[in-house]
Amino acid sequence: ILNQLGISLAVSTYQAGKLIMLRADGEVINTHFRIFPKPMGLAADHEKLAIGSTLQVWELRNVPAVAAKIDPPGKHDACYMPRRNYITGDIDIHEMGYAGEELWFVNTRF
């Protein structure tokens, strides 16, 4: 399905503290794991990826010039690099989404 749609899938797992990127690599699934402190909510578009973690929101931006340099050549069409970090305090961000250029999220910890 990922291959047919030409997409990747981002999955957060707060118990393991990881963001998992899944993508098609021919007929198999390729995974990339990155550590974030208690990642929960995610929001994405073609240019940005936001990750809500235990004390902050990370905003990553797609840098195509970097993607072109990742081995093996020609396999990666995007590379999301950290660009901003917003300190939120100890909250639980479960749902996130972009409304135009604004990032909105739902906090379930009061």
Q: For the regions a protein language model found, what residue spans apply to each?
A:
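Sequence-structural signature of mature extracellular/luminal beta-sheet repeat domains
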Residues: I1-F110
